[in-house]
């Protein structure tokens, strides 16, 4: 436990450089992963909308030919 506290805090009670760099890397990684997750979700939504529109058009054409 002492090692962990020594890793987190320096002698003057400030957050150590290693710990602050670790936190910064974790936060930046989370931001990058979130960006790509949102980007992928938007692309998937757009692709699904295209499929729905195509299916709707095919169904509409098929039903318009029925007399």
From Swiss-Prot:
A motif (QXSXEXXXL) lies at residues 14-22. It is found in: Secreted; Cell surface; Fimbrium. Transmembrane segments: none annotated. Residues 1-13 form a propeptide. GO terms for cellular component: cell surface; extracellular region; membrane. The N-terminus is cleaved by the prepilin peptidase EppA, which recognizes the class III signal sequence. Signal peptide: none annotated. Pfam families: Class_IIIsignal. Keywords: Fimbrium, Secreted. Contains an amino terminal motif QXSXEXXXL, which is part of a class III signal sequence. This is Probable pilin MJ1400. It comes from Methanocaldococcus jannaschii (strain ATCC 43067 / DSM 2661 / JAL-1 / JCM 10045 / NBRC 100440).
